[in-house]
């Protein structure tokens, strides 16, 4: 009994610490209600206490919430819904959740359950269509953000598991589903962590081969970086610019991809690192000073203009801004140099979380990529009502993603019917179609389809 009381006190205290921002739910009473709900659920069904890795579901969820708050910037009822997801597995339980915690929490929880109901097949998971299906089924962009945080947190905690099969399944989802979504959202730090951890679990020998080689060559690499940046430092100082520089070793996953693409060993990859120059510039002078540094560097070192990447003039759809150039340094080695400001660097590293501080970065485009990028402006408001309106996805107004009986995933226009799906598969199938069987039930050719269905 004493142990249960201690756990309850710890849960409430942890919740209050995580939800410390005055604009973030829950208040003290709600923290206690959450504790009551979880305590009751696990007492009724003890199997809800631990997951397939033997980890305590509630404690694991609390750690994921802290990650989501600190590293992504998520706020509001999505956090409560995610925590309750640890002990709620059936849609009909959401009615009870709504009575305890309100409509918004229950609706978000239903989104989590819809995503969990999707049957994940590795072949389909590798496609943009599957990622778009997940986004569509979630219905609320914060659910997708929480799922990214959930995946990162879980990957951090399963390194010593004996359940290797489950570890490989989670790692595959991390590599092909959540890392690409994190990339689209500009969450590069989390994306890189997911990629490295998935490689560690899926390609153990390759991961440690690269890691050991990086450790063995660190001293010579650091010495080369110092020789490369010394003249640049003198030039920047002479111009009176405020800045700092660092050499950034490419991620293990990135190096592994280069080795496969170039069909070479570790020592055949020439660009193991990049130099990052980060300027302390006022926003009004950001571009001017970045291009000034570009001019100084290309005057000093021979440049490869084919490798110029200008994301200052036109930022990436996820808000990424930087200027990349590859130049020939000492010993005729090609070196990538990234030029950006403090603001740009924080957004590049922390994505959405940084946009709570830096306002006004906008993107344009179409489709799901544009939608993912545009949620940034809604997150900046901090207004729960506007967030709900801006982040909610009306599936009926978006593309429909449906599976064929063989498990292939198809993207269809909004309001597509059984007949539309038949013609998408093959003209002959459409010509012969007089009805369809969707999720085991018969429907007319005019029946509208919903994302996630199997026809």
Residue ranges: model-predicted function:
Residues 2-23, 42-50, 60, 66-70, ...:
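Nucleic-acid processing machinery
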Residues 34-41, 78-84, 108-113, 144-155, ...:
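Short alpha-helical scaffolding segments that buttress acidic/His motifs in well-ordered protein cores
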Residues 51-55:
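Outer-membrane beta-barrel domain signature
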Residues 81-115, 187:
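Hydrophobic or amphipathic alpha-helical targeting/insertion segments
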């Amino acid at each position: 009994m004493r142990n249960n009381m201690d756990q309850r006190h710890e849960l409430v205290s942890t919740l209050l610490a995580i939800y410390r921002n005055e604009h973030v739910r829950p208040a003290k009473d709600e923290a206690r209600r959450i504790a009551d709900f979880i305590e009751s659920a696990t007492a009724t069904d003890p199997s809800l206490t631990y997951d397939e890795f033997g980890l305590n579901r509630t404690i694991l969820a609390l750690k994921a919430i802290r990650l989501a708050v600190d590293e992504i910037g998520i706020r509001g009822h999505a956090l409560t819904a995610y925590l309750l997801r640890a002990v709620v597995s059936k849609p009909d339980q959401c009615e009870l959740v709504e009575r305890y915690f309100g409509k918004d929490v229950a609706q978000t929880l239903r989104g989590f359950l819809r995503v969990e109901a999707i049957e994940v097949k590795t072949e389909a998971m590798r496609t943009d269509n599957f990622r778009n299906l997940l986004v569509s089924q979630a219905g609320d962009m914060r659910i997708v953000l929480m799922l990214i945080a959930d995946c990162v947190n879980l990957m951090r905690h399963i390194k010593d598991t004996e359940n290797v099969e489950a570890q490989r399944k989670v790692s595959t989802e991390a590599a092909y589903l959540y890392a690409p979504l994190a990339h689209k959202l500009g969450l590069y730090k989390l994306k890189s962590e997911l990629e490295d951890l998935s490689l560690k679990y899926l390609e153990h020998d390759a991961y440690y081969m690269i890691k050991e080689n990086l450790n063995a060559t660190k001293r010579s690499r650091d010495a080369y970086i110092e020789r490369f940046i010394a003249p640049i430092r003198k030039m920047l100082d002479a111009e009176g610019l405020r800045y700092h520089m660092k050499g950034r070793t490419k991620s293990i996953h990135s190096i592994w991809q280069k080795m496969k693409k170039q069909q070479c060993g570790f020592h055949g990859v020439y660009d193991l690192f990049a130099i990052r120059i980060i300027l302390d510039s006022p926003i009004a002078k950001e571009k001017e000073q970045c291009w000034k540094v570009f001019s100084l560097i290309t005057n000093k070192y021979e440049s490869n203009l084919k490798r110029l990447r200008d994301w200052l003039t036109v930022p990436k759809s996820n808000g990424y801004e930087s200027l990349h150039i590859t130049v020939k340094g000492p010993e005729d080695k090609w070196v990538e140099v990234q030029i950006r400001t403090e603001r740009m660097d924080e957004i590049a590293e922390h994505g959405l979380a940084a946009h709570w501080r830096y306002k006004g970065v906008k993107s344009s485009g179409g489709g799901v990529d544009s939608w993912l990028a545009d949620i940034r402006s809604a997150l900046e408001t901090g207004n729960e009502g506007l967030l709900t309106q801006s982040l909610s996805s009306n599936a009926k107004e978006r593309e429909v993603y449906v599976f064929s009986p063989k498990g292939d995933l198809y993207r269809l226009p909004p309001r597509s019917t059984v007949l539309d799906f038949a013609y998408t598969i093959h003209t002959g199938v459409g010509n012969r179609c007089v009805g369809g069987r969707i999720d085991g039930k018969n429907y007319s050719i005019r029946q509208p389809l919903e994302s996630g269905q199997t026809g």
